[in-house]
Structure formats: C-alpha cells, structure tokens
Amino acid sequence: MSQHELPSLPYDYDALEPHISEQVVTWHHDTHHQSYVDGLNSAEETLAENRETGDHASTAGALGDVTHNGCGHYLHTMFWEHMSPDGGGEPSGALADRIAADFGSYENWRAEFEVAAGAASGWALLVYDPVAKQLRNVAVDNHDEGALWGSHPILALDVWEHSYYYDYGPDRGSFVDAFFEVIDWDPIAANYDDVVSLFE
C-alpha cells in the first residue's frame, strides 16, 4: 500500500502576500493539510490490517476517516495549485466560454460562487457535472458533505476558518476577494479541458 505524502507548495510561503499571509499559508499547509495526509494514511493502514485479520471492529470509523481525510487531502492539493503570486484576472479560452454559456456571464458565475463560499462550512467548488454536461457551483460542508456524486472538481476554494481568520477575522467575504486576487486560471482551465475530454 502506497503512502500519501504532503505535496510541496508551488510557490514560497510568503508568495501570496499581502492577500494571504505567510503565517496562514505555513499553518494551513504544514499543519492542517499534513493532518489530513496523516489521517488518510492511518485510516488506510487500519483497513488493511482489518482485512488481514478479519477483525472489523474499527472498520466503520476507518471508512469515515478515509472519506473525511481523503477529501481534505485531495481538495487542499487542488487549492494550493489554484493560486499564484502572478494570478488574478478572469479565465480565457474554452473555460471562459463555458462559464458564459452555463452561467450567463463570468459576473453571474462569480456572484453565485461567492454565495456558495459564504454558505459553505468547508469548501466552495466549481465542478463539472458529467450527467447534465455542465458546470455547477457547489457548497460543501466539512470536506465531504454536499458534494455532487460523479462530478469533477475544477476549482477549489477552502473556506474553513483556518483559511482566513488570522488575516481577516470573521470577514470571510474579504478573504474570498483576496483569493480572486491570486487565483491561477491556468491549472483550472487544464482541469476543465481534461474532464471535458472524457465526457464530451
């Protein structure tokens, strides 16, 4: 069984300042994200041991831990990749066209996404729904409650308090605005291209 590892950041810890502080990035990546990696590895080890011994007394808890920590790990990995010190602006190309087609305009999409970010107690996601073949905004509680089965995340924004409270206090809206100052549309567009190639 392979061990999951904490990925390195694609930029320096202070690279997103003044929008997101070095302290928050350090805590968030090195402590919070690491805890999900550790929790996922531990849960998978428990499941492997239980399958070997046939004793499943701890299996239910481990299954829940895989879901919680796995989603936390995977979404955080996307979150780091979706920011850059050279970010900001709006999407272009095929992704921009699809956002306009599915939401009416970029402005409509962003307004709805910001509502999702304000409503969620976990994550705001832009996902591709392969059943309806359209983009959707999703408000996810924790890491794994409220997700749309079968959908593929294109963009991930962490709105847990540990993402912003040190920098912005209870003003989550200012943190969301700050995220859009550092958003990197290139990997998001690549995610979109990859998933559309599978279903359209």
Swiss-Prot record:
Manganese as a keyword of this entry, yes or no, is yes
Q: Which Gene3D superfamilies match?
A: Fe,Mn superoxide dismutase (SOD) domain, Iron/manganese superoxide dismutase, C-terminal domain
Annotated protein name in UniProt: Superoxide dismutase [Mn] 2
Q: How is the cofactor bound?
A: Binds 1 Mn(2+) ion per subunit.
The protein's gene is named sod2
> What species is given as this protein's source?
Halobacterium salinarum (strain ATCC 700922 / JCM 11081 / NRC-1)
Q: Name one Pfam family in it.
A: Sod_Fe_C
Recorded catalytic activity of this chain's protein: 2 superoxide + 2 H(+) = H2O2 + O2
User: PROSITE patterns this protein is in?
Assistant: SOD_MN
Q: What class of enzyme is it?
A: oxidoreductase
